[in-house]
Amino acid sequence: LLRAFEKAENEKNIEKRSKYLNFVVVGGGPTGVEMAGSIAEIAYRNMKEEFRNFKSSDANVYLIEATDKILPMYSDRLSTKAEKYLTDFGVKVRTNEKVIKIENDSVTTDKESIQADNVIWAAGNEASPIIKKLNTKTDNEGRAIVDPDCSIKDDGNVFVIGDAANYKDKNNITLPGIAPVAIQQGKY
């Protein structure tokens, strides 16, 4: 991030400079939302007075999510609140937009091409391949569907936690595959 700002500071060509100041975060889950917010905070607040050849407001932070909302695993209320916070902070939130191609200096979606040297991939991951060997029910992301004690449906002696597990809370909402959830499940 800082290197991108340094490159922009040293670039005299305004068009070339803009690609150093474009930051594209692909994936609107917890990691992508946090990353886009952090980049925006650094770009628009922390680096505000640091450069002479451009304004930090020249930076563009894009958050691209393929589904119809960011934080799709959370409630609509939380998703809407997070999107408002990000857009108020200057992040360009793009939902229902799929990334088709990433090259050295651009990101192409099904709607446009963005010149950017800075791309952060935070969109999805595959569940552990060992889950397939368990011969248990899985969700569309390949995660094992688990009971409240984190055991798999077919064998109460096999437990799956973290991003390999599809664990639903008391409101039937699947918990995200992030470290705090995995730590709590591991302690359980």
List PLM regions with ranges.
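Short loop/edge segments at beta-strand edges and connector loops
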Residues: 95-97, 103, 162
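Active-site flanking residues adjacent to catalytic metal/cofactor-binding acidic residues
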Residues: 26, 33, 64, 161-162
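Rossmann-like dinucleotide-binding cores of NAD(P)H-dependent redox enzymes
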Residues: 19-23, 38-97
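Glycine-rich nucleotide phosphate-binding loop and flanking beta-alpha elements
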Residues: 32, 70, 126-127
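FAD-site-proximal beta/loop scaffold in flavoenzymes
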Residues: 1-12, 105-108, 113-187
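Short secondary-structure boundary/capping segments
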Residues: 15, 53-54, 150
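Hydrophobic alpha-helical segments that mediate membrane insertion or helix-helix packing
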Residues: 35-39, 186
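Glycine-rich dinucleotide-binding loop and its adjacent helix/turn
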Residues: 1-31, 39-45
